Amino acid sequence: MAYRQTTTKTTFEVNNVIQPIFTGGSVALDNGARILATTLGEQAVLTELNTGKQLAEIEGDGEPISTLTITPSASHLIVCSRSLTMRIYSLKVSPDYDSIEATLVRTTKPHATPVVVLAVDRTSTLLATGAADGAIKIWDIVGGYVTHTVSGPSVLISALHFFEIAALEDQASNKNKKNRRKSTAEEEQAQDDSVASKFRLAYGTQDGKIRIFDLSKRKTYPVYADPTSRREAHESNVQSLDYSPELHALLSGSRDKTMTVWLWKEGTWRGTPMLRHEGVEAVGFLNNGSLMYSAGTSGLLRLWDTTTHQEITAKQDAKSEAESIVSALALPHKNLVVCAQSDFTLALYRTPSVADATKKSTKPLEPFRRISGTHDEILDLVYLLPDQSLMALATNSEDIRLVSVADKQPQLGDEEEGAAYFGHDVALLKGHEDIVMSLDVDWSGHWVASGAKDNTARLWRVDPANNSFECYAVFTGHIESVGAVALPKIVPPENSEAFKNPLDHPPAFLISGSQDRFVQKRDIPRTSQKGAVSTSLRRLAHEKDINALDISPNGKLFASASQDKTVKIWDSATLEVVGILKGHRRGVWTVRFAPQGMPAIQGETGTAVSGKGVILTGSGDKTIKLWNLSDYTCLRTFEGHSHNVLKVVWLRLPKAADDAEDEAAAAASKAKQRIQFASAGADSLVKVWDANLGETECTLDNHEDRLWTLTVHPKTNMLVSGGSDSRVTFWKDTSAETHAAASSAALKLVEQEQQLENYIHAGAYRDAIILALQLNHPGRLLGIFTNVVTTNAPEEGSLCGIKAVDQVLGNLSDEQIFLLLLRLRDWNTNARTAPVAQRILWALVRLYPANKFSNLSVKGARGQKSLKEVLNALRVYTERHYKRIEELVDESYLVEYTLQEMDSLAPPAIEERDGDLVMADA
């Protein structure tokens, strides 16, 4: 049976994107803990912290951002870059925190070297900039001018902090205001001056110095560890500073592995250092000064008692190097600390309340939420759980990241710890010691297999309902990286215990393939194993690296794809080769068995293939091949990618008609099913193919680098692509919506065309012109105007012949005027239709002032440039027609002159008088 292509168009649209927001550098948060500002290379990104929604992405100036900050009131964003420029943006937040309008209000060059640190005071009016050459300036944010210049040291400024030493006294005085007489205006002014005189700026340097600048006196005061010997506060970078108005104490943290509390005594700052075993990157006061926190290279957030200077968090082991903390910021009034890690993850911690802070010890702090700033290079991804609400990502690291892809969105103001939104980080699967390269999942979505560069494969048990994410078994035996793993996907009977409780029934076996060219089959134990699981069967499979594995739907066969340009089909029970697929000219990167229930597929020769089924392969030769598993021959080759094909997946088959009356009708319905698959390549494109026609149905483009992985939602046909650009794109199948919209538009078009015919037939030119413009029918519009202009009985006072048409022309929108000018331009190029065009153009010029045409606002047009081109074309042809008419007039005088000359040469006229002919006098 010949395959006939359906007219339904296949379309996909971007439904969601998980994309990077932070790739190292500065992190800032407003006072309401709602707007997170992060550095993304040359760009600044603003994100709503509760919902994870990206509110704005601010383009850079071509150079990487050196530092940024946001004011506590979220009124301004300040961005400094390596180009030595500082840009100040005014922020306008929507009431529902759904978007932010960032307006550039000022660009300046603050220093001769890059600005490396910024600080804003609590009133959001003052900004301090610290440069790499040690220069410090204080700015008025709104005014954009420098208020103070600090003569700092000639070394890099590493920390800045505004504080007010009179804040505590002001609070106490405010409590007693009701019991005192009202101050006079002079007293209030004096009080304001007193408060202003207490503003200070503390700064730390790369060589361990701490200085305090008095904004009122414009003086700088040193802070020495030993005032007598003038030994500096620290021996290395001062990374963080904070001030407690309750204690009148300054806190500093340094990479010399110390943090110090400085108290004002006897006219000088005296410090009490607390030795630590890690470089300190961030410190601060919590709970009105009763607690201190510190964070550093160990990746731990520690709490300290301010009075005893002792750590109150229980002993904890240092975390991995990737989890070391490089910076932190705290909002004590929100009991929140946000830590930035080396792997570009933002970890959010809840700090103890005032009541809990009185305890002498507390359990180690763990983040209640993680935000992946970037997922780095995404090597593989799979859907998890029966409802496909989680996704596992292999992200060029030793940990597997689990993210939420559920449709649920948090409500405004929902600050529940761990509240899931789309793209929210749920958990990390830790266990591998090197980069995870491949993933696979069983039928239930609760069991995940992984292969890594540590030469092992692991099986993970995922149970988010009980917050359980554990490694079930470790499989060793390979001597090189495990680049491919596969699990059987046989669905057990619905009444079986394995179907009802999949968490208690792991898959039967696991297949792994490695760069050591071996494939191994491992029988999975029924109980969790602490040690390594031995290999059941092992075979030397290929001559080069094994790139991909796939198990057939019934579990009886599996396929291995290799860099040796071949794909081998194996018996799963015996690990014996049953067939070899040869034909690719380069290494094979991906392989995928057709799903169960696949209809017969038509090959290039026109022969329908069913039987044992078919299999897809994608290769470095830029082609995809469809193979017959009955005789292992190539049925069809698909060409279209411009680079390596790295992943192929079958799309879900459309459901056959349920109302088929007999088996023959059901078979016919199944035969008409559209068989499609998708591919992802190193050309950063996703292509959807028709398996029977061998043609591309559509091409999807939303990535900037090679795509390593592609998967499909088993129920909705949602495609998910990921690759080297750190972006995960979710493509929604909109074919049904597109078909419905096209059908509706076609039906509406037929109705409108019939209505237009009715208007023309009835002579309702007013309605006909409006509809013809709407439908963009230039031929019919010309016919209407021709009838109007050439009417035998033009109405008196009408510009074009009929006053109703004049009224229509005088009430056109900008888009309609522009469209009509386009049509007049085309008609004006033809001498036959030019008179009609000139008449209508004359009517338009009379009906509208000149500024109407010069200020046309048209969507889709290239602005004034496009309008100028149209008017210029009208002018050129109008001048040509005018010249032609002038020449015709001149030629008409020649005819008159000729006739006159002919009259002069004629004999005198003969006049008849009284019946006689008499010659007239000459």
List PLM regions with ranges.
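Loop/turn segments within WD40 beta-propeller blades
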Residues: 26-33, 68-75, 112, 117-125, ...
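Extended acidic/polar alpha-helical scaffold segments
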Residues: 798-922
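A structural motif specific to WD40 beta-propellers
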Residues: 15, 53-56, 97, 103-106, ...
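Blade-level signature of beta-propeller repeat domains, shared across WD40, Kelch, NHL, RCC1
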Residues: 708-739
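WD40-repeat beta-propellers
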Residues: 44-48, 86-91, 136-140, 210-214, ...
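Conserved strand-to-loop turn within each blade of WD40 beta-propeller repeats
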Residues: 39-40, 80-83, 130-133, 203-207, ...
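WD40/WD-repeat beta-propeller blade N-cap
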Residues: 16-23, 59-65, 108-115, 150-157, ...
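Intrinsically disordered, low-complexity acidic/Ser/Thr/Pro-rich linker and tail segments
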Residues: 1-56, 64-67, 73-98, 159-221, ...
